[in-house]
Amino acid sequence: MRLTIEVIKEKIVERKLFKRNRKSIEVKILAGLLYYLGLSLRKVSLFLSQFEDISHESVRIYYHKIKEVLNEPERKERNLIAIDEIKLKVGDKYIYAWSAIDVETKECLGVYISKTRNYLDTILFVKSILKFCSNKPKILVDGGKWYPWALRKLGLEFEKVKFGLRNCVESFFSVLKRRTKAFFNRFPNNSKFDTVISWIKSFMMFYNWVKSLT
C-alpha cells in the first residue's frame, strides 16, 4: 500500500498516537515533514500558524512521534547492502551515526548511534538490519578496520568498495549532513543520547517515506 498522507492519518487515528487532537492531523504530519526537509522548528511553527496555532515545541513532538506510524523496511531477500558511519557532535563530544542502505532499492534499512566505533558496534548494528533480510546479503564497506572480523563472525560475505555501489549510503549521509548543517552539524549541549537516537531514527523514517513517493 502506498503510504499517502491519508494512510498515515488513518494509522495515527487507529494507534491514538496523540493524546490531544485539537490540531488537525494533516497539519501535524506536514509539520514533521517540513522539519525533516530542513526548516527550523520555529520556521515550521511560523508557517503553519497561518493555518493553526502551533508552537515550535509541538513541531518537535510531531517529528519524533510520527515515525511510529511510518513503514519499517519489509523483510525480504536482499542482494547488496552498503554500510558506513559518520561522526556527529553532541555538545562538546562526538558520536557515530551508522547507516545501512539496500543498494538496489536505495531504502535505508537501519540507523545506529554509538559512542564508540569497534567490532561490537559493527555486530550490534548489522544484526539489527538483518531482521529485514530473509537471506544473508553481501555487505559493501569502506576500509574501516572494525568491519572484517565482525562480518566474518556473522558469516556474511563482504567487499571493500570506496565508490560506485556504495554511493547510495554516501547519498544518505549527504542528506543527513545537509539537515544537521542547520544547527552547524552539532546537537545542542543539553541533548540527551536517547533524544539524538530518536531524532536520527525519525530522520530515517521520513527519508524512506519521501523516497517511496518519488
From Swiss-Prot:
Supply the InterPro entries for this chain: DDE_dom, RNaseH-like_sf, Transpos_IS6
Entry's Pfam families? DDE_Tnp_IS240
Top-level taxon of origin: Archaea
What is the name attached to this protein's record?
Uncharacterized protein MJ0017
Species in which this protein is naturally found: Methanocaldococcus jannaschii (strain ATCC 43067 / DSM 2661 / JAL-1 / JCM 10045 / NBRC 100440) (Methanococcus jannaschii)
